[in-house]
Swiss-Prot record:
Belongs to the Maf family. One of its GO terms (molecular function) is nucleoside triphosphate diphosphatase activity. One of its GO terms (cellular component) is cytoplasm. Its cofactor is a divalent metal cation. Nucleoside triphosphate pyrophosphatase. May have a dual role in cell division arrest and in preventing the incorporation of modified nucleotides into cellular nucleic acids. Pfam families: Maf. InterPro entries: ITPase-like_fam (IPR029001), Maf-like (IPR003697). The active site is at 76 (proton acceptor). It catalyses: a ribonucleoside 5'-triphosphate + H2O = a ribonucleoside 5'-phosphate + diphosphate + H(+); a 2'-deoxyribonucleoside 5'-triphosphate + H2O = a 2'-deoxyribonucleoside 5'-phosphate + diphosphate + H(+). PANTHER family: BIFUNCTIONAL DTTP/UTP PYROPHOSPHATASE/METHYLTRANSFERASE PROTEIN-RELATED (PTHR43213), BIFUNCTIONAL DTTP_UTP PYROPHOSPHATASE_METHYLTRANSFERASE PROTEIN-RELATED (PTHR43213:SF5). Its main location: cytoplasm. Its EC number is 3.6.1.9. This is Nucleoside triphosphate pyrophosphatase.
Amino acid sequence: MTPQPRRRLVLASQSPARLGLLRQAGLAPEVLVSGVDEEAVTAPTPAELALALAEAKASVVAAKPEVHGALVIGCDSVLDLDGQALGKPADAEEATARWKAMRGRAGTLQTGHCVWDTASGRHVSATASTVVRFGEPTDDEIAAYVASGEPLHVAGAFTLDGRSAPFIDGIDGDHGNVIGLSLPLLRRLLADLGTGITELWAPAED
């Protein structure tokens, strides 16, 4: 029996971290940025906002003619601190204030996931949550971290796999979800659409 050709996989995100997670899991997605105006999307809670943003990104890319037949993944992450949704800080001043508010405390990183099957027109979505326990960096350490520029490009002004890693005491939940994508949740969403994640593995290199 002739094996079915591997489905195209499209990541509706410009995040190098999400792309890296997918590649490490044996997947080889194409990248097509949605261009969604994130500031225009609102929702009552941080978890609902993360999901709404993920759904918006995936739906915009799924509607493009050039991806017809592909599976499209959209994700977005938001830090929930005291019920407030914290995305990327607007500037260095805001990033500094965020870190001074977060240190010694815990927040919940909410990552919305949406997968569109453009062949069938079906889509599924869900949110994964991971508790992040922040350490207590000094004012000088916060200033140095903000000066590096890294916190200006990531949700919550921190990243688990970058320069802020020493300032995070631990997490409760999925490590990948904090970086930007929960692979266990992605597997379940793909299964809901009738696709096994192993069917999407890229051929092993010789």
